Amino acid sequence: MADYTEEDKQKVLAQLSKKTWKIPELAKILKMDKKVVKKIVQDLINEGVAGYWSSGSTTYVATKEYIEELEKKRAEG
């Protein structure tokens, strides 16, 4: 059972589609509890909508589409 609203989920999803985020940063700009944001992100990952992306030293989260764009740019150099 989720302890967040569909509106909360949509806010997180909207931000994840714009750029990569570390969960604490995402929680801060959304003014939401970090645990709630982490739960929403995990649910989005489980649904196949979001995913993790690593810069090599740091792990971020974003939508699958945004991650695909980043990987394409990375491959192109």
Swiss-Prot record:
Q: List the disulfide bonds.
A: none
Q: Name one Pfam family in it.
A: DsrD
Question: Which SUPFAM superfamilies did the record assign?
Answer: Winged helix' DNA-binding domain
Lineage top rank: taxon: Archaea
Query: Mind telling me which InterPro entries this protein's record contains?
Result: DsrD (IPR014793), WH-like_DNA-bd_sf (IPR036388), WH_DNA-bd_sf (IPR036390)
What does the UniProt record say this protein does? Answer: May play an essential role in dissimilatory sulfite reduction.
What family name appears in the similarity comment?
A: To D.vulgaris DsvD.
Q: What is the protein named? A: Protein DsrD
Which gene name belongs to this protein? dsrD
